[in-house]
């Protein structure tokens, strides 16, 4: 009899435990439902939406690429994780003494390397702010010469044009050595400001000398569209390249208004689209020579 009572008591205890566990499970389920409902209310609340929006704006502001001066760009070039914060296609602006606000297109990121600078941006003017002849007529070359190293346009870029760049912006520019053709022979120039070559804007073949690999901006999308430019009045503009027409010493290559490659006599007035390299200000190294990275050539 006592054994049976003990068994009954044990069964009752187990039943109570099971009931309690079931009650606890129901309470947990109810709590979970309450938590889910509370979480849903929080997620749908206007306060949270405003907080998330504010946080997103703060992140975007922290990561924003400033469209300020070259000096500002150089100071902000390196991101939080050591990467270059700028991208091919970005527009950077600079106030020039002669032309006012000039917009520059990023055509290469970390392409033209420089000792002492972790990052660089290669930029080219978005529009032709002036028209110039390639070189002056002379007794030897009545229609001008297509020899870029000794050209009037190279002298203009590194003297009159360069002097119009604000000092703090000019200090960010790196002397860049670029391949060119001099009197039919392979040569190079080392300048702070320079003209792009036919090969650098994506042309090849048909007697075009290799004067540098295409910059990334000219290898994406429709290359002809990428090459098109306008002038200071918003009209379509043809502009000079530093590449000669190897079949005629009086003719230099240029990009026509439709983005194609043509040649004009060197004493013709064409648009000027300067290019240059901005070095990041993450180093105390002085402005020095940059070197085109071989990886994309």
Regions found by a protein language model. Name each.
Residues 18, 38, 89-91:
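A general secondary-structure boundary signal
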């Amino acid at each position: 009899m006592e054994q049976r009572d003990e068994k009954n008591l044990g069964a009752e205890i187990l039943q109570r435990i099971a009931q309690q566990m079931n009650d606890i499970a129901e309470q947990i389920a109810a709590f979970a439902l309450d938590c889910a409902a509370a979480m849903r209310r929080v997620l749908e609340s206007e306060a949270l939406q405003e907080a998330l929006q504010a946080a997103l704006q703060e992140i975007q502001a922290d990561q924003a690429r400033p469209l300020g001066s070259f000096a500002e760009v150089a100071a902000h070039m390196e991101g939080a994780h050591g990467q270059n914060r700028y991208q091919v296609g970005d527009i950077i602006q600079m106030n020039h003494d002669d032309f006012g606000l000039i917009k520059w297109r990023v055509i290469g990121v970390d392409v033209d390397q420089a000792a002492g600078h972790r990052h660089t941006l290669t930029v080219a003017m978005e529009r032709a702010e002036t028209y110039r002849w390639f070189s002056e007529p002379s007794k030897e070359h009545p229609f001008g010469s297509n020899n870029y190293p000794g050209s009037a346009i190279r002298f203009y870029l590194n003297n009159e044009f360069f002097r119009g760049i604000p000092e703090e912006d000019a200090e960010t520019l790196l002397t860049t050595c670029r391949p060119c053709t001099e009197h039919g022979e392979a040569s190079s120039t080392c300048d702070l400001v320079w003209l792009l070559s036919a090969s650098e804007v994506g042309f090849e073949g048909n007697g075009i000398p290799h004067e540098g690999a295409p910059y990334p901006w000219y290898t994406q999308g429709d290359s002809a569209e990428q090459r098109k430019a306008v002038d200071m009045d918003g009209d379509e503009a043809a502009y000079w390249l530093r590449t000669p027409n190897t079949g005629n010493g009086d003719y230099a290559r240029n990009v026509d208004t439709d983005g194609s490659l043509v040649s004009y006599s060197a004493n013709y007035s064409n648009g000027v689209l300067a290019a240059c390299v901005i070095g990041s200000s993450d180093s105390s190294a002085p402005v020095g020579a940059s070197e085109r990275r071989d990886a994309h050539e």
